[in-house]
Amino acid sequence: MSGRRVYSTSVTGSREIKSQQSEVTRILDGKRIQYQLVDISQDNALRDEMRALAGNPKATPPQIVNGDQYCGDYELFVEAVEQNTLQEFLKLA
């Protein structure tokens, strides 16, 4: 699978996950960075794919990848935004 993807879930009881997903998509949309939203709640294979790319069998959304390269999770994303290194984080530079 190619391109930037944000792994998310539409089914969660966690306000924290919902908030983190919203913030990631809001920032990407605001910077006009194209991405595909992948809803892992629709298929366990997608959840397994997300966890394999993250290298963490317990990884939870949101997780960001570019092609087959893992970019990071919410915390790393926010850190990149704060340090103005989002292009590098997303492996665009």
UniProtKB/Swiss-Prot annotation:
One of its GO terms (biological process) is cytoskeleton organization. Disulfide bonds: none annotated. Keywords: Acetylation, Cell membrane, Cell projection, Cytoplasm, Glycoprotein, Membrane, Nucleus. GO terms for cellular component: cytosol; nucleus; ruffle membrane. The modification N-acetylserine is found at residue 2. It holds the Pfam family SH3BGR. It is found in: Cytoplasm, Cytosol; Cell projection, Ruffle membrane; Nucleus. May be glycosylated. Could act as a modulator of glutaredoxin biological activity. May play a role in cytoskeleton organization. InterPro entries: Glut_rich_SH3-bd (IPR006993), SH3BGR (IPR051033), Thioredoxin-like_sf (IPR036249). This is SH3 domain-binding glutamic acid-rich-like protein 3. The gene is SH3BGRL3. Glycans are attached at residues 2, 9, 12. It comes from Pongo abelii. Belongs to the SH3BGR family.
